[in-house]
Regions:
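Hydrophobic helical membrane-anchoring modules
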Residues: 1-3, 8, 14, 18-21, ...
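Acidic helix N-cap motif at the loop->helix transition within catalytic regions
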Residues: 14-18, 43-52
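Donor nucleotide-sugar binding loop of glycosyltransferases
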Residues: 12-15, 41, 70, 96
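Short hydrophobic beta-strand elements that form part
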Residues: 4-8, 35-36, 63
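Short, acidic, metal-binding catalytic loop of nucleotide-sugar glycosyltransferases
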Residues: 21-31
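Conserved donor nucleotide-binding strand/loop of the catalytic core
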Residues: 32-33, 46-80
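A conserved acidic beta->alpha catalytic loop
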Residues: 38-47, 93
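Acceptor/aglycone-binding surface of glycosyltransferases and processive sugar-polymer synthases
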Residues: 64-80, 85-88, 97-172, 199-211, ...
Length: 232
């Protein structure tokens, strides 16, 4: 298997059917496995995934009984991956799976091994850009290397990078952590523009207004400080 794409699903019962059918239609384009992590959902996501994926090829289901964070779902997906290259997407369809396929296509043409692909989000609301800018400045100062749009997806990289992970975080700070490790290990960073879609179904588990953004940013700040202190 050349590519493993991880998609954590948490309370996404309204999206999983459309998501799985779309991924299935793309499965023959590349040597790819879709690792769907049922991340301890409290709704009917797990039952729907079992039913929808029953006759789908190139799909691997990973079950987590109790949600321990977005990053934990990614980690469990990585542990169950077999691809030479690994990466991840979200299940809410705000970023089209076609974006990951663009990354894969670019990688197929590349002759470099140490490349880290990461999205760069476009057409976002002012308030979202404001928080992203602030968090990018904070992360850049904290880790003493330029880090921009730290939460952007998709992400794709060679699995050799995983050997450099140490106590990978289980929350949303995983995005910054992996990005930072890639830069520290002198990976070539390639950013591709990602045009965001509005969430059509379901609700975000955390993004429900400006106060939720503040709380989420504060949680990530504390997590990043802990990561930085461990590196000292």
């Amino acid at each position: 298997m050349k590519y493993s794409v991880i998609i954590p699903c948490y309370n996404e019962e309204d999206n999983v059917k459309r998501l799985i059918n779309l991924l299935s239609s793309k499965s023959d384009l590349y040597d790819i496995e879709w690792i769907i992590v049922e991340n301890g959902s409290k709704d009917n996501t797990r039952n729907l995934l079992n039913k929808i994926c029953e006759d789908k090829k190139n799909f691997k289901l990973v079950y987590i009984d109790q949600n321990q964070g977005y990053g934990y779902g990614i980690v469990k997906g990585l542990e169950n991956s077999s691809g030479d290259y690994v990466g991840w997407l979200h299940a809410d369809m705000q970023v089209s799976p076609d974006s990951m396929l663009e990354f894969i296509q670019l990688n197929e043409l590349s002759k470099e091994g140490k490349v880290f692909y990461k999205g760069s989000r476009k057409n976002r609301k002012f308030i979202d850009n404001f928080f992203t800018f602030f968090m990018s400045i904070f992360s850049t100062l904290l880790f003493q290397t330029f880090l921009s749009d730290i939460g952007a997806i998709p992400v794709l990289f060679h699995r050799d990078l995983m050997k450099k992970f140490d106590k990978i975080p289980y929350d949303f700070s995983i995005e910054t952590y992996v990005y930072y490790i890639a830069k520290k290990e002198n990976y070539k960073i390639i950013r591709l523009p990602i045009y965001m879609n509005e969430r059509k179904k379901g609700v975000s588990s955390w993004n429900r207004g400006i106060f939720s953004k503040i709380k989420q940013s504060w949680r990530i700040i504390k997590a990043l400080i802990k990561i930085r202190l461990k590196k000292e």
